Amino acid sequence: MTANTQSQAIVRVVDDDPDVRRSWQFVIEGEGWNVLTYASALEFLEKDSPFTPGCLVLDVRMPGMSGIELQHEMKLRGDTLPIIFISAHGDIDMAVKTMKDGADDFLSKPVTPERLLDAIEKAVKRDARIRTESAALEQARAAFRRLSAREQEVATGVARGLLNKQIAYELNISAVSYT
């Protein structure tokens, strides 16, 4: 992990227990991470920005909106922030469900600081990779939109793996006219 990635990332901790929030904040900040804590899923949704890189350390069972309900809401909003679930009451079915729904990890309490920090590092690396890939994809889309309609047709043929002659035949043009 680069120091730049770590300094830009924010680890969000959402847990209804203030002692747990303070404890995890102390451990995570002690390793040089930026940390924001939230007492509930609703507070997280109201105050957090999905545009800031990092990850979410999330308790499964909380009053009001549960961690699993928050995961579902984030998915509906298109928020791709990696989630690390922590639970004292989790079971295999719950862990499998959260992972199938996109969670990065599911840790059972008690969790060692080393295990949590390892999960955070992996999640933040994945988030950085996703954000880089998304930015590159958006640049490619923007470049494609700047092409003329005919150039877009040719580019689509190339993307489909067609040969120049095949593209020319499909578009009823000379292969020489666009190569």
What does each of the following model-derived ranges do?
Residues D91-D93, L107, V111-I120, Q166:
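C-terminal output helix
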Residues E46, I68-D79, K97:
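Short amphipathic alpha-helix used as the core "switch/output" element in two-component signaling
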Residues D59, S87:
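Active-site residues of response regulator receiver
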Residues R12, F51-V57:
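Active-site beta3 strand of CheY-like receiver
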Residues Y178-T179:
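Conserved small/polar residues in nucleotide/adenosyl-binding loops
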Residues M62:
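Receiver (REC) domain active-site loop signature in two-component systems and cognate sites
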Residues A39-S40, M65-L70:
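Acidic catalytic/metal-coordinating carboxylates
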